[in-house]
C-alpha cells in the first residue's frame, strides 16, 4: 500500500487577514488641508489605525521589492554622490530598466552631507555646475567654481529625485558581502551581488548561521568610496579573486590632478563591473581630491553613460 500523500493544511491567510475588526475610517479625514488644520488643534485627531496594519504595509512592500529586484538590470553599490548621480541618469535615460541601489549605511548620501572638516558649504568646480542646474540645486557662482550653501541641499535634492523614479529601489542598511561570478572568455564576468544586513555583516566573527542573499544583474556599478571599513569593497575583492594584481593606492591630495583623473578613468574594470568615484583611486593610484565634489557627480554621469553603452551586450551574456 502506498504511503499517504502529504496534504497541506487549508490556508488561513485570508482568515487571519480578516479575523480582526479594523478601525473604521472617519468620513472627513481626507478633506483636511494644512490651512484647515492650523489653529484647530483642540479638535485634531489622526485617522484610526491598528498596529498590524502598519506591520503589514511595511512588510508586504519590502518583500515584494526583494522579489522584484532579485533579478535586476543594474545594481549600484553605494548611494553617495557618485552612486546617486549615476542612478539619476540611468533612471532618466532608461526608465525600462530595474535599478537596485545597495547602501550599507542607514542614511544614504555618503560623505556628501557636509563639506570639508564638517563645514556646511559644498564646492563644485566647473563644469560640474551643469549637473546642479540639471537637478535644480541653486548655487553661488565664484568664477571657476560654484558654492552650494549646504551640502545637504544637493544630497537631499538628488536623493528625492532618484527615489521618486518608479524603476529604482534603494536597499539601505544593506551591504554587499561578495560578487556573483560567471566564467567568460575574459576569465570571469560579474553577474550580481551577494547581500546581507549591514549589522549582520559586522558580526560574522561573533555569530553564526547568517548566510546572505543574492541579486542577479548583468551589470554592477561600484561607487563605494576610497579604502575604509566598507570602502573600495569591490576592487579589494577583485584582488582577492586575482582579477587585478594589486591596488594602486590613493595618492596625496591634489585637486587639479584628482578630479580629472577620476572622471576620465571611470570605466568597466572587469566584465560586468564598472567602478567610479573615489573607489577608482584605489585601482589607478589617483590623487585624493579633498572637499570638492564635482568629480563625484560627473564620475557618476560617466558611469551611467558607460553602463548604457555595454548593457545590451552584458545582458545577452547574462541570459545564456
Swiss-Prot record:
UniProt GO cellular component terms: cytosol; nucleus
Pfam families referenced in this protein's UniProt entry, alphabetically: Thi4
Annotated positions of the 2,3-didehydroalanine (Cys) modification: 209
PTM note: During the catalytic reaction, a sulfide is transferred from Cys-209 to a reaction intermediate, generating a dehydroalanine residue.
Predominant localisation class: cytoplasm
Induction cue: Repressed by thiamine. Induced by ethanol, Cu(2+) chloride and heat.
Gene Ontology biological-process entries: thiamine biosynthetic process; thiazole biosynthetic process
Cofactor(s), by name: Fe cation
Co-factor binding comment: Binds 1 Fe cation per subunit.
Localisation: Cytoplasm; Nucleus
InterPro entries in the cross-refs: FAD/NAD-bd_sf, Sti35, Thi4_fam
Molecular function GO terms recorded: cysteine-dependent adenosine diphosphate thiazole synthase activity; iron ion binding
Keywords, ordered alphabetically: Cytoplasm, Iron, Metal-binding, NAD, Nucleus, Stress response, Thiamine biosynthesis, Transferase
Family annotation (NCBIfam families): sulfide-dependent adenosine diphosphate thiazole synthase
Protein purpose: Involved in biosynthesis of the thiamine precursor thiazole. Catalyzes the conversion of NAD and glycine to adenosine diphosphate 5-(2-hydroxyethyl)-4-methylthiazole-2-carboxylic acid (ADT), an adenylated thiazole intermediate. The reaction includes an iron-dependent sulfide transfer from a conserved cysteine residue of the protein to a thiazole intermediate. The enzyme can only undergo a single turnover, which suggests it is a suicide enzyme. May have additional roles in adaptation to various stress conditions and in DNA damage tolerance.
PANTHER family given in the database record: THIAMINE THIAZOLE SYNTHASE
Subunit structure: Homooctamer.
The protein's name in its UniProt record: Thiamine thiazole synthase
Origin species: Fusarium oxysporum
Gene name in the database record: sti35
Amino acid at each position: 500500500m502506498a504511503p499517504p500523500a502529504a496534504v497541506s493544511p487549508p490556508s488561513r491567510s485570508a482568515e487571519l487577514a480578516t479575523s480582526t475588526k479594523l478601525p473604521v475610517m472617519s468620513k472627513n479625514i481626507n478633506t483636511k488641508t494644512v490651512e484647515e488644520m492650523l489653529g484647530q488643534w483642540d479638535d485634531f485627531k489622526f485617522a484610526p489605525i491598528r498596529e498590524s496594519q502598519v506591520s503589514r504595509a511595511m512588510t508586504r512592500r519590502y518583500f515584494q521589492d526583494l522579489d522584484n529586484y532579485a533579478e535586476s538590470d543594474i545594481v549600484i553599490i553605494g548611494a553617495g554622490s557618485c552612486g546617486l548621480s549615476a542612478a539619476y541618469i540611468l533612471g532618466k535615460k532608461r526608465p525600462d530598466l530595474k535599478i537596485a541601489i545597495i547602501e550599507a549605511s542607514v542614511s544614504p548620501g555618503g560623505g556628501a552631507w557636509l563639506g570639508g572638516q564638517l563645514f556646511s558649504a559644498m564646492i563644485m568646480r566647473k563644469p560640474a555646475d551643469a549637473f546642479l542646474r540639471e537637478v535644480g540645486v541653486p548655487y553661488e557662482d565664484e568664477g571657476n567654481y560654484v558654492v552650494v550653501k549646504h551640502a545637504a541641499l544637493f544630497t537631499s535634492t538628488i536623493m528625492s529625485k532618484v527615489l521618486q523614479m518608479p524603476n529604482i529601489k534603494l536597499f539601505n542598511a544593506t551591504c554587499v558581502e561578495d560578487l556573483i561570478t560567471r566564467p567568460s572568455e575574459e576569465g570571469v564576468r560579474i553577474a550580481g551581488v551577494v547581500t546581507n544586513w549591514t549589522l549582520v555583516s559586522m558580526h560574522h566573527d561573533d555569530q553564526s548561521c547568517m548566510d546572505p542573499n543574492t541579486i542577479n544583474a548583468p551589470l554592477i556599478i561600484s561607487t563605494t568610496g576610497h579604502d575604509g571599513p566598507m570602502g573600495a569593497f569591490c576592487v579589494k575583492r577583485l584582488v582577492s579573486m586575482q582579477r587585478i594584481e594589486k591596488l594602486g593606492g590613493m595618492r596625496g591630495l591634489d585637486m587639479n590632478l584628482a578630479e580629472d583623473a577620476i572622471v576620465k578613468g571611470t570605466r568597466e574594470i572587469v566584465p560586468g563591473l564598472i567602478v567610479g568615484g573615489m573607489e577608482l583611486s584605489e585601482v589607478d593610484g589617483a590623487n585624493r581630491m579633498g572637499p570638492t565634489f564635482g568629480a563625484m557627480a560627473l564620475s557618476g554621469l560617466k558611469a551611467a553613460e558607460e553602463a548604457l553603452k555595454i548593457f545590451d551586450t552584458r545582458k545577452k551574456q547574462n541570459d545564456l
